[in-house]
From Swiss-Prot:
GO terms for biological process: DNA-templated transcription. The gene is rpoA. Residues 1-235 are annotated as: Alpha N-terminal domain (alpha-NTD). Its EC number is 2.7.7.6. This is DNA-directed RNA polymerase subunit alpha. Homodimer. The RNAP catalytic core consists of 2 alpha, 1 beta, 1 beta' and 1 omega subunit. When a sigma factor is associated with the core the holoenzyme is formed, which can initiate transcription. GO terms for molecular function: DNA binding; DNA-directed RNA polymerase activity; protein dimerization activity. InterPro entries: DNA-dir_RNA_pol_insert, DNA-dir_RNA_pol_RpoA/D/Rpb3, DNA-dir_RpoA, RBP11-like, RNAP_asu_C, RNApol_insert_sf. SMART domains: RPOLD (SM00662). Residues 249-329 are annotated as: Alpha C-terminal domain (alpha-CTD). The N-terminal domain is essential for RNAP assembly and basal transcription, whereas the C-terminal domain is involved in interaction with transcriptional regulators and with upstream promoter elements.
Length: 329
């Protein structure tokens, strides 16, 4: 039912089509005429420029002093190897910077799966080829620095005045931290009752696998909303002083379970049990979770490990849960 002519229609999430684990189409309708392009372009720009991610920022290759050289027994030159290193899709858990190593010998391809790393690192595309070794005695050894960041940062932006102390052979890479591989939007016609001049926004997006497309849309919309809050009340543009109040609950307990980045199976099992927040989850016991349909011991172990990495555990008691801020949702 349409309201007053001055009322704005509020869009609703119509469909999320998961084409693949890294490719999704999100449809929103109805939108007032013109708002399809307004919101679509804003979200597209935020997705391209402001999504956090991880990338290789520095590399040292044994026997290589600069990028304009080659290495015996390696098919690619160093510049091509550096380009291939940029294509590694990596996730860091609980750290903002790590140093990884890679050593391989013998004929054949060298892939991202050959990188040695700890449990806090996940290589999402282990099949990604870095270079090819062309002889039985060929060998390559390198150390990679992976950092967390946002957007695109050229190597020149990380060069400082004290950079003369940087060892010869440590090569800096232009880093594309954004997990968004491709983003496009299309505005189609929509209809509500007798109105045919409305917009339908279709966002088509691919990621490198380190960030779920649905979560990327959610984060970009949150960033946009936070930036627009300043325009809601223009009378008070000063930043209010923050009162040092001890929060009733640890902020991590108020975050959705999606932030734990569990496997799809585990996440779906929790949602089926109406476990939407981390605070809901930590109050459950192991016995209670094992009674959840389709949630086995492997999923339980995964949940316990992820909680432990954040200093949490199952079976916790939370007084006055849920807080009013989420109880009304």
């Amino acid at each position: 039912m349409l309201g007053s002519v001055t009322d704005f229609l509020k869009p609703r999430l119509v469909d999320i089509e998961q084409v693949s684990p890294t490719h999704a189409k999100v449809t929103l309708e109805p939108l007032e005429r013109g708002f399809g392009h307004t919101l679509g372009n804003a979200l597209r720009r935020i997705l391209l420029s402001s999504m956090p991610g991880c990338a290789v920022t520095e590399v040292e290759i044994d026997g290589v002093l600069h990028e304009y050289s080659s290495k015996e027994g390696v098919q690619e030159d160093i510049l091509e190897i550096l380009l291939n290193l940029k294509g590694i899709a990596v996730k860091l858990e609980g750290k903002d910077e790590v140093t990884l190593s890679l050593t391989k010998s013998g004929t054949g391809p060298v892939t991202a799966g050959d990188i040695t790393h700890g449990d806090e690192v996940e290589i999402v595309n282990p099949e990604h080829v870095i270079c090819h070794l062309t002889g039985a005695n060929a060998e390559i050894s390198m150390r990679l620095k992976v950092q967390r960041g946002r957007g695109y940062v050229p190597a020149s932006a990380r060069v400082h005045n004290d950079d003369e102390e940087r060892p010869i052979g440590r090569l800096l890479l232009d880093s594309a931290f954004s997990p968004i591989v491709r983003i496009a939007y299309n505005v189609e016609a929509a209809r509500v009752e007798q109105r045919t001049d409305l917009d339908k926004l279709v966002i088509d997006m691919e990621t490198n696998g380190t960030l779920d497309p649905e979560e990327a849309i959610r984060r970009s919309a949150t960033i946009l909303a936070e930036q627009l809050e300043a325009f809601v009340d223009l009378r008070d543009v000063s930043v209010p002083e923050k009162k040092e109040e001890k929060p009733e609950f640890d902020p991590i307990l108020l975050r959705p379970v999606d932030d734990l980045e569990l496997t799809v199976r585990s996440a779906n099992c929790l949602k089926a049990e109406a476990i939407h927040y981390i605070g809901d989850l930590v109050q459950r016991t192991e016995v209670e979770l094992l009674k959840t349909p389709n949630l086995g011991k492997k999923s339980l172990t995964e949940i316990k490990d992820v909680l432990a990495s954040r200093g949490l555990s199952l079976g916790m008691r939370l007084e006055n849960w849920p807080p009013a801020s989420i109880a009304d949702e």
